Amino acid sequence: MSTEAHPTVQGCLVSFPTPHILLLTLNRPEKRNCISLATSAEIQRLWTWFDTQPALYVAIITGTGESFCAGADLKEWNDLNARGITNEMTAPGLAGLPRRRGSKPIIAAVNGYCLGGGFEMVANCDIVVASENATFGLPEVQRGIAAVAGSLPRLVRVLGKQRAAEIALSGLSFSASQLERWGLVNRVVEHDQLLATAVEIATAISRNSPDSVRVTMEGLHYGWEMASVEEASSALVDQWYAKLMAGENFHEGVRAFVEKRKPQWRPSKL
């Protein structure tokens, strides 16, 4: 793991369950882990730092207490409104996640209430593991707001228009098991197994070639962003395949397979 100090994040805990995994824990349980503007900017800086650290391969985000995240700090929003200040909704959004396009995967370990901006954050995470106690919702319409940070087109893509409409227009809450059936949640697990499951998945990813993970992330981004699957496939091959084949990890992976040994991966240089 890098010895470079990570950026500080107020109201959060930053730890490293293994040398290759970063764990960010939202730690304002008395406020349902809502995120202030200052904390949002600091978390965004943490993700930028994470993407530049060659020894860190995967990140996990979770929360303490009964909530994962209830979104933005609406008390702060109310104060801004009273002063005539508009809260700008610019990319990449709350905590740097709703419209993030990172080079490394982030796993959401949803431990409880996941509402508003918290749900918008999760909708763009690469893998979602949820506690059996978790609930999800977009109550923005009940507050005179709208979920414009990035989740709506993503939910339409993942769930279909009608399911996305039910979530976004009703403001109702939905169980983790419901969203697992609909395809947004990868796994629903017992509450006390949540973090262990997320770390297990992250560890499996971290054992793989960093170059392969990097190129695979680009392929996933292309599939997400482009209308044509053929255009996305061609873009991935044209822009990344030669780089992957020329890298040390490609040669090491094939050589290790032939020699029947565990590969010794190098930090990605792609």
Swiss-Prot record:
Pathway: Siderophore biosynthesis. Its main location: other. Gene3D superfamilies: 2-enoyl-CoA Hydratase, Chain A, domain 1, Lyase 2-enoyl-coa Hydratase, Chain A, domain 2. Its EC number is 4.2.1.-. One of its GO terms (cellular component) is peroxisome. A motif (PTS1-type peroxisomal targeting signal) lies at residues 268-270. One of its GO terms (biological process) is N',N'',N'''-triacetylfusarinine C biosynthetic process. Disruption phenotype: Blocks TAFC biosynthesis, decreases resistance to oxidative stress, and attenuates virulence in a murine model of invasive pulmonary aspergillosis. Keywords: Isomerase, Lyase, Peroxisome. It is found in: Peroxisome. Pfam families: ECH_1. InterPro entries: ClpP/crotonase-like_dom_sf, Enoyl-CoA_hydra/iso, Enoyl-CoA_hydra_C. GO terms for molecular function: isomerase activity; lyase activity. CDD domains: crotonase-like (cd06558). It is an enzyme of class 4 (lyase). Mevalonyl-coenzyme A hydratase; part of the siderophore biosynthetic pathway. Aspergillus fumigatus produces 4 types of siderophores, low-molecular-mass iron chelators, including excreted fusarinine C (FsC) and triacetylfusarinine C (TAFC) for iron uptake and intacellular ferricrocin (FC) for hyphal and hydroxyferricrocin (HFC) for conidial iron distribution and storage. TAFC consists of 3 N(2)-acetyl-N(5)-anhydromevalonyl-N(5)-hydroxyornithine residues cyclically linked by ester bonds; FC is a cyclic hexapeptide with the structure Gly-Ser-Gly-(N(5)-acetyl-N(5)-hydroxyornithine)x3. Belongs to the enoyl-CoA hydratase/isomerase family. This is Mevalonyl-coenzyme A hydratase sidH. The gene is sidH.
